[in-house]
Design a protein with these regions (language model features):
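A structural signal for multi-pass alpha-helical bundles of membrane permease subunits
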Residues: 1-234
Length: 234
């Protein structure tokens, strides 16, 4: 038989082994705690930063915007050593916060740029009318800006969730206890010095990909709209 031929019979045994040997449910719990918190945090901070950059004039505004753009040139690998030392000093290793904080910081620049481009396309007249009706800045942001920014917020949510969910580098460094490993970190446990169970690995990869596919399918309509907002000015 060829290595590429279909199996003689199909079985769910590898999936059963994945749940029994790898403690997948616990790993899912930590993954969703980390990725969900990162996604919500990035959406909140990025929308607030974009609102300030697009609606207010202040000294050093251009420098702040340039700093946000420039920060995209520095990958997480370049800053992981000082971040790791900081987490050690704060006694946060093997804590979800040790992964959440660096991931929020790593996603914030891109998310702010996406949100800024979208907010620049929102007419100021809508906000001015709300101010004339007696609304304060917090109500304008919550009632007008946030609902209109749903496409860009969906884009930010998708990219933040996927990046956090698949980020093996930060998770592996900050999470030292195997019982607290997120789902993507479990793949390393399948490969060992004694060999690799490819059936178990294939089943585990399928289990890991399922949440990613669900998130993408639910929010895919807003990706292009959110990324291209503000690209054309009329």
């Amino acid at each position: 038989r060829s290595s590429f031929s279909l199996p003689q019979e199909f079985t769910w045994g590898n999936y059963e082994n994945a749940f029994s040997k790898l403690n997948v449910l616990t790993a899912y719990k930590y993954s969703f705690i980390i990725s969900g918190t990162v996604t919500i945090g990035v959406m909140i901070f990025a929308s607030l930063m974009a609102f300030g950059l697009t609606r207010y004039r202040f000294k050093g505004k251009g420098f702040v915007h340039a700093l946000i753009v420039a920060s995209l040139m520095f990958p997480v690998f370049a800053t992981i050593i000082p971040v790791y030392k900081m987490m050690v000093q704060w006694h946060l290793l093997s804590n979800c916060i040790a992964v959440i904080l660096p991931q929020i910081a790593g996603n914030l620049s891109f998310a702010t740029i996406v949100m800024t481009g979208f907010m620049q396309s929102i007419p100021l007249e809508m906000e001015e009318a709300a101010y004339m009706e007696g609304a304060n800045v917090f109500k304008v942001f919550r009632k007008i800006i946030v609902p209109l920014c749903r496409p860009s917020l969906a884009t930010v949510a998708i990219f933040s969730f996927l990046w956090s969910y698949n980020d093996l580098f930060v998770q592996k460094i900050m999470m030292r206890e195997p019982k607290k490993f997120p789902i993507s970190t479990l793949l390393e446990q399948i490969s060992s010095q004694y060999g690799t169970d490819f059936g178990l690995m294939a089943a585990s990869v399928t289990i890991i990909v399922i949440p990613v596919m669900i998130v993408y399918v639910l929010l895919q309509k807003n990706i292009i709209k959110g990324l291209t907002a503000g690209a054309v000015k009329g």
